[in-house]
């Protein structure tokens, strides 16, 4: 293999690592650092990497190599981010040659997502936990748990497969709120506001929002604005879905339910219950977003 071919192969591996990181929710600075770490270890210092929120541009000043990849905004799979990050440090420590690194990256990229039942469990437990955190009582939490479960069943079986991102976001919030309204009208729960807050928590685009802020703080203004726009669009879709569901409910029952605001139920207001609820909600969302258990 000539020096030029070797250099191009190294840049291909670095680009592959960046691709996996970016499409699974890593921030821009992590993507750039990882790509530079890999190429530097293999002796290629002529690579230049320009990373946006949905694209990677790779060029070399020592050859004619150039690569542009479009990477659409997708779901969050933090286990793959952790795996690539760990692999890059192993590469820097000299534990893998180029062929092994390429093979490892392919294994990470082809790794299956979390099983559907784990995602459904994470959504249900997260909705239940955060309903309690925001003041819901035991019946409110039970209603949020059931709604969170059916919400993610709907997300996995229908909206993520057949609907666009915007329409899917609106329909997810619509379905969640309609289920909350149905549960409340049947007598499950005492605070509709708390049930809805807990139920829609799995839909909140928290990772894109935080990454957008971090990118702006790192002076990556294009990527930061793009991700913040994506997150704000998600918030808008949730609000539109919730509002539409109240309009439908009011049309069916000749009147919109008056929300009393967030009510702190004394059943779960104690420090012990709040700590337990926060732990359950955080652990559930860690499962939902694919955070690995072993570090």
Residue ranges of each PLM-predicted region?
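Catalytic cores of large soluble enzymes that bind and process phosphate-bearing ligands
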Residues: 6, 23, 27, 72, ...
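Core alpha-helical transmembrane segments of integral membrane proteins
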Residues: 113-208, 285-293
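Hydrophobic alpha-helical hairpins/lids featuring a short glycine-rich hinge
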Residues: 74-145
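Helical membrane-embedded segments and adjacent short helical loop/helix-boundary regions
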Residues: 74-79, 115-120, 167-168, 234, ...
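A generic alpha-helix surface/boundary motif
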Residues: 12, 29, 33, 82, ...
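Soluble N-terminal domains of membrane-associated systems
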Residues: 1-100, 109
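Generic detector of multi-pass transmembrane helix bundles and their immediately adjacent loops
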Residues: 185-295
């Amino acid at each position: 293999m000539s020096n030029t071919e070797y250099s191009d192969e190294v840049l291909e591996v670095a680009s592959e690592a960046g691709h996996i990181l970016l499409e699974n929710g890593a921030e821009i600075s992590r993507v750039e650092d990882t790509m530079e770490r890999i190429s530097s270890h293999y002796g290629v210092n002529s690579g230049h990497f320009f990373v946006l929120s949905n694209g990677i541009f790779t060029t070399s000043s020592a050859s004619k190599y150039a690569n542009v990849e479009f990477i659409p905004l997708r779901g969050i799979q933090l286990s793959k981010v952790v795996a690539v990050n760990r692999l890059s440090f192993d590469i820097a420590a000299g534990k893998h040659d180029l062929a092994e690194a390429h093979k490892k990256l392919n294994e990470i990229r082809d790794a299956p997502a979390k099983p559907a039942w784990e995602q459904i469990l994470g959504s249900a437990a997260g909705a239940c936990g955060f309903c309690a955190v925001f003041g819901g009582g035991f019946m409110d939490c039970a209603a949020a748990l059931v709604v969170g479960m059916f919400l993610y069943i709907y997300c996995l079986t229908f909206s993520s497969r057949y609907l666009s991102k915007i329409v899917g976001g609106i329909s997810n919030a619509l379905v969640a709120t309609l289920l909350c309204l149905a549960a409340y009208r049947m007598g499950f729960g005492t605070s509709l506001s708390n049930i809805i807050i807990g139920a829609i928590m799995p839909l909140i685009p928290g990772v894109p929002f935080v990454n957008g802020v971090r990118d702006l703080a790192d002076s990556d203004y294009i990527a930061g604005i793009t991700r913040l726009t994506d997150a704000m669009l998600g918030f808008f879709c949730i609000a539109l879905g919730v509002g539409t569901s109240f309009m439908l409910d009011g049309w069916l029952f000749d009147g919109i339910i008056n929300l009393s605001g967030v009510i702190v139920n004394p059943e779960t207001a104690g420090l012990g219950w709040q700590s337990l609820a926060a732990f359950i909600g955080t652990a559930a969302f860690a499962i939902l977003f694919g955070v690995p258990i072993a570090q």
